[in-house]
Structures are given as C-alpha cells and as structure tokens.
Curated annotation (Swiss-Prot):
Protein name in the entry: Serine/alanine racemase
Pathway: Amino-acid biosynthesis; D-alanine biosynthesis; D-alanine from L-alanine: step 1/1
Family note: In the N-terminal section; belongs to the acyltransferase 3 family. In the C-terminal section; belongs to the alanine racemase family.
SUPFAM superfamilies in UniProt: Alanine racemase C-terminal domain-like, PLP-binding barrel
Binding positions for substrate per the UniProt entry: R465, M646
Quaternary state and interactors: Homodimer.
UniProt GO MF annotations: acyltransferase activity, transferring groups other than amino-acyl groups; alanine racemase activity; pyridoxal phosphate binding; serine racemase activity
Keywords noted in UniProt: Antibiotic resistance, Cell membrane, Cell shape, Cell wall biogenesis/degradation, Isomerase, Membrane, Peptidoglycan synthesis, Pyridoxal phosphate, Transmembrane, Transmembrane helix
C-alpha cells in the first residue's frame, strides 16, 4: 500500500534533517533559522515516526493478533539491524570527534547506545525502537484510545524537558526533570517523544477517509501559525534545553500527514525510501568533509552554500551507489536450476475462484481450504494470492499447518478443522488460530486450560467422524463453557459427491439436521457466529444452500476428485499445477538392451533414452511405469519407458533427440486423467507430491 506523496516527502523530510544540522540561514537571517529550520523543519522526524505508525502499528491498534504483532516485531528487528549498521559505520567519526572515547564510563556508554546514539543524528533509531517496544506492550494489553491519551500525557511531560524547559526552571517540578536528564539525558527519546507520533500515524490511518481536504488544509495553516508563535515566544523569552518538541507540533503533523497522503507529485525521485534513509544516515560524513575543506575554501563557511554542497554531494553519491547496486544485482540475478518443480498458475487459481463465486449465493463467501499444503499445490504460494483476491478466511487440517500460514504472513482468520491437543492451546492463542471443537470432551478439555481462544463448533450431522452430538442440550452446554468464544458453527457432508438416491437422502438428512440446530439456537437467541456446510462437491451438487461460507479445496486446484461422477452444477476449471523436471542426461541404447531396472522394457531398435530428474519419491506413482504414460516438451510427446525409479525416470527421445540437457520437461498437467489411470482420486495424486519438489509461481 505504497503512497507516492508519502514516499516523495520522505526525501524532503531527510533534507529538512540535513538543514537542521547545517543551519543554512544562520548568517543571512538568524531569526529565520529559528522559525524555519528549528521550528517548521522539526516536522521531519515526527513525520518518519508517523509513517511507522501508519503502516506498521495500525493493525495492532485494531486487533491483537499474531499477524499484527509479527509485523511490528519484524519492523523492530529491521530497525535494530539498521541501527547496528549505522553505529558501526559512524564509529570512526564518533571517535574522531570525541563524542565517545575508550575512557567513557560504562553507565554513560549504555546511555549513549540506548538513548542518544554515538553521533548526533543516530538518536532517532533508539528512540524509534524504544517507542515501538513501549507502544507494542501497551497495545497488547490496553485499548488504543487509552494508549493514545497516555502517549499524549508523556509528550506533555516531555515538553518540560525540551523546548519548554526554560519556563519550568526555578519551579517545584525542576528536580523531576533533573532526575530525567540524569537517567535519559533529555526527553527527546522513545518514552516521551516517539509514542505520540506513532499513535498519530495510527489515528490518521483510521480517519483518513473521513476528512475534508479544504478543512484539513485550513487547520494545518492555523496550527502552523500556532507553532511559529509558540517557537518565537519560547526562543524570545526563555532558553529551551532543546527545540525538538513543541506543543503545536503534534497538531501540525496531524493535519499535514493527510495532506501528504493526497499529494500526487508529477516529478519524483527514484527509490525515495532508500534515498531518504541513506541521506539521513550519510550526511554527517559529508558535513565533516565540508567542514574540513572550509578551512581552505572559504566560501564553504557560508552556511547556506555549505548546506547545498552537503545535499548535492550526499545525494549524488547515493544516486551513483544505488544505480551501481541495481545494475550489479541485474547482472547477478540468475534463475536457479531446479531438479523438479511444481509450477503454480496464479491466473488459473483466480479463474477457479471466480467460477466458484459465480455459482454460490451472492451473500455467501469463500473459506479457502488449503490443508495438506493446499492439496500439494503449495499453501505458501496459494494462500497469499487468494488473500489478495479478497478471501478473508482459510481452513487447514492441523495446528502446524495454521502456524506455517501465519509465519508466511497470512493475516485472515484461519480455522483448524482437525483435532488440536489442549496442551497446545497457548499456540492457538499466540498464532490467532480458530480451533474446531470436535467433541464434547474436546470442548471441556480446552476450557479447563483457562486460556481464551476462538472456536468453531463442529456438529456431527451424520458423517460420524468429527463433531458434537446434534442435540440442543449438548450444544448449549458447550456454549456455557468459559474461555471458549464460539464464532462459528459448521458440519461436513459425507455423501455430497454422489447424486444417487441413497447419497442424496443422506445429504438431505444432514442438511435438515444442521438447519434444525441453527433454528433452535436462533429461538434461544444464542449468537453462534458464521455458518458453513458445503465443501467442493457440496458447492457443485447443492449450490442453492445459503450459509455464510463455503469450503472449496480441490475445486480451487482446478480438478475434480472423480471426473466420472456427474455433478448438478457444471464449472469450467483450469488446473493450477504443472509438474516439471529436468532432462539431466541422454544416451543411445542398442537394440535388444534392457532399459532401467529389471527387463520390463527392452529396446526393439536403437533408442535415444533421456533421464528426467523426478521419481516415485517425489510423489509420481510407480504404477505409471510402462503404461503408455507420456511426458511432453514444447508440445512433443515423450513416452515414459522402463520402471520409474526413486529419483528418476526414463523417456524415449528417439523422435526428438536434440532436446538440450537441463531442458524442463512437463511431467503432469492433466491430473484427473492421470489419477484415473492409476485408479485413485485427484486429491491423493496431487497431495503425494514430495517436499523435494520446489514450488514456483507462473
């Protein structure tokens, strides 16, 4: 969710930071340096903080879920790495300028590293990291509204240790600030300064669509005037300890940020994020260089010229570096050769999703079942594509499958359809997984753990595999259990894939049982959340049912379990998976020679044999051996010969012996026909693909 205005203003904000460190108007107009450089340009660092709040903390402020927490923790890790890199980068300059030394007391060194940084501009990183940790710990336990007002209170306290310090001197509260200075060296840090602007970023994200542009611009101008008056007063009638924190500064940012969001600049910097970061990081080295040169080049003693030279040199160096970096990566990037791949078609997946949505009720949504690694197609690849396409609920078979999805940044709710031991209940909560209650005993055991979790209640309507007894008293007893929030009710149809009379009678009984339970819950005004009953064949054979969700699995892969079984609703499906492997060698075999293991295949003439790097260990059925099973290369059919080995198979290349080594050979594209050939269902064939087969998005 990049925003061009935000990205381009990053560079402007970095230039403002450079100006603060160069004081360009110092000799030409000292008062202007105070009002412009040390006042207006102070929006720069809070702007960077607000970006973090806007993009990183907005989700955590709404819901304390694993994806939102993980996003924040990953962000903090990244900032720690940048801070470590910057510290190492500026260690020579810090030692040279005597900002730090080898004789520095341990306590002071700790304060420098945790609060100020080893050079004057590096305070930003510990402030951001500390503020992020503080805000995260608060949001996990307290509502955003309370956190916001706490952050605002901390900022007001911080004013007294910054620009308002001159006014609180010789007052009863001065000893408090003396203690703060002793511990933290000031209030421009991650405790008093950063949290409010992170919260403001979140607040703008929540309210961005509600604001009138003209009113926002008007309030921005009014608050900016207030900021200038405040600064003029504080600098004119007191001596601020620092001038980073003003009373009107948060107000200015609150109205400025939405204006930047709606800004659409015509001329833009390339790679603005990297440019602004490196401009912020590197400019002190350029300042040190121009300061040294100013002893011989007197014009550099003019602060404005010095500022412009610092900008030009730093930006020029960064642009050259980035250009060279991207050029180097372009030359270095090569597609790694894989012995075997399952190529996943995003286009086919989205087509299948649209076909499903076409036949279900407009009010019914899709809960994508991605168990068994998305039926062997690769959940890591499939789930993000579906989520981006609007799928807002996923289902898996086990807790570990759910955890893997979470670690691959899937944000939507995830339902665990199978059994999870109550001993793992903390993992359910940690990863924000919704657990199926599969029996009365399971419900009681989960509740006894005294850990609040989200659940869906599975009802055994007649399949007799998983689910609670379909009686209202049994179900109500589960609703009464503490710590279990039941946000959904579902069941599973055992014979929906057949349209013979017995199967249809059984299915109608299950539907009637499920509907009766829902009716009785409604009559008792029990809130049971969402409902779902149909899986893939339930969708095709009973499309007129109206529940909140359907649960397609094999349908999304573009296949049917059994193509010989007719369905009430026809759909146009596209297989999303193509199995490919490399041609790794080829050789000429004389007439009469046995090929491969045993003597099941003997060359009846001189034959060019190719070896392909895939075997039954990778999930290819060995029963396909010598069964007229054909591979293909650019439309050319390549018959499989001999017994399929564990890691390889052999093909007849007599009609196309010039295929280059390391060419990709198509092994399987029509999964349904191949499943029929080996007398199994498509589900099993796809799920057999082994872990050695790499996944790739087409």
């Amino acid at each position: 969710m990049k925003n061009k205005g935000i990205d381009q203003f990053r560079v402007i904000a970095a230039m403002m930071v450079v100006a603060i460190h160069c004081l360009p108007l110092h000799y030409l107009w000292p008062e202007g340096d105070i009002l412009i450089t040390l006042t207006i340009f102070r929006v720069a660092v809070p702007f960077f903080f607000m970006i973090s709040g806007y993009y990183v903390f907005a989700e955590l402020a709404v819901a304390n879920s694993y994806p939102s927490r993980q996003r924040v923790f990953n962000f903090i890790k990244k900032q720690l790495k940048v801070y470590l890199l910057a510290t190492l980068m500026f260690l020579p300059l810090a030692l040279y300028s005597q900002t730090i030394g080898f004789d520095l007391p341990v306590g002071t060194l700790v304060q420098v590293l945790l609060v100020n940084g080893i050079l004057y501009h590096l305070w930003y990183f510990p402030a951001l990291i500390t503020g992020s940790l503080l805000l995260t710990s608060l949001l996990i336990h307290v509502s955003f509204k309370k956190v916001f007002w706490l952050a605002a209170g901390l900022y007001l306290i911080g004013l007294g240790g910054d620009s308002w310090f001159g006014l609180i001197q010789q007052t009863p509260i001065e000893p408090f600030y003396t203690a703060v200075f002793h511990l933290l060296d000031g209030t421009r840090n991650g405790i008093f300064f950063t949290p409010l602007f992170l919260c403001l970023g979140v607040l703008v994200r929540k309210q961005s669509e509600k604001r009138s542009l003209s009113k926002t611009a008007l309030f921005f101008l009014i608050s900016l005037i207030g900021l200038l008056i405040e600064s003029a007063y504080l600098h004119g009638f007191s001596i601020p300890k620092h001038d980073s924190m003003y009373l009107f500064l948060p107000v200015v940012l609150f109205f400025l940020f939405p204006l930047i969001l709606r800004w659409h600049p015509h001329r833009t910097w390339k790679h603005p994020g990297q440019l602004s970061l490196w401009l912020y990081l590197l400019h002190p080295y350029t300042i040190a260089g121009t300061h040294f040169l100013s002893q011989k080049i007197s014009i550099l003693q003019n602060n404005l010229i010095n500022y412009l030279v610092v900008l030009i040199l730093t930006i020029g160096f960064i642009c050259l570096f980035l250009r060279q970096k991207h050029s180097w990566f372009r030359h270095k990037q090569t597609t790694p050769v894989k012995r075997a791949v399952k190529e996943f078609s995003k286009t086919a997946l989205l087509h299948n999703l649209q076909e499903i949505q076409r036949i279900i009720s407009p009010k019914t949504k899709v809960m994508a079942v991605v168990k068994a690694d998305a039926y062997g197609c690769g959940a890591k690849e499939v789930a993000p594509v579906l989520e981006q396409a609007g799928i807002d609920f996923f289902a898996v078979a086990t807790i570990d499958e759910g955890i893997r999805l979470r670690k691959n940044a899937v944000k939507s709710p995830i339902l665990v359809l199978g059994y999870t031991s109550p001993k793992r209940i903390k993992e359910l909560r940690r990863y924000s997984l919704t657990q199926s209650i599969i029996s009365e005993g399971h419900a009681v055991a989960l509740s006894q753990r005294k850990v609040a979790i989200d659940c869906h209640l599975a009802i055994d309507t007649g399949m007799h595999r998983l689910g609670v007894t379909p009686t209202i008293d049994s179900i109500l007893s589960i609703f009464d259990l503490p710590f279990l929030t039941i946000s959904g009710v579902y069941s599973h149809l055992g014979s929906a894939d057949r349209l013979n009379p017995d199967s249809m009678i059984r299915t109608q009984k299950q539907i009637a049982c499920f509907d009766q339970i829902l009716l009785e819950l409604d009559q008792r005004q029990i809130s049971y959340g969402i409902t779902h009953l149909q899986s893939s064949y339930g969708i095709l054979n009973y499309p007129d049912l109206n529940y909140d969700y359907v649960r397609p699995g094999i349908l999304l892969t573009g296949s049917l379990s059994d193509t010989n079984e007719p369905t009430k609703q026809r759909v146009s499906l596209q297989p999303i998976l193509t199995l490919k492997a490399q041609l790794i060698t080829k050789r000429v075999v004389a007439k009469g020679e046995a090929i491969g293991y045993g003597q099941t295949a003997v060359a009846n003439q001189e034959t060019t044999v190719g070896v392909v790097s895939i075997g039954y260990c990778d999930g290819l059925p060995r029963s396909l051996s010598n069964q007229e099973f054909c591979l293909s290369y650019r439309g050319q059919s390549l018959p499989q010969i001999g017994l399929i080995c564990m890691d390889m198979l052999l093909i007849d290349l007599s009609h196309c012996p010039t295929i280059p080594i390391e060419s990709e050979i198509e092994i399987l594209t029509d999964w349904s026909d191949t499943a029929e050939q080996v007398q199994t269902i498509t589900n099993e064939l796809i799920c057999r693909i082994g872990p050695r087969v790499s996944a790739r998005i087409k």
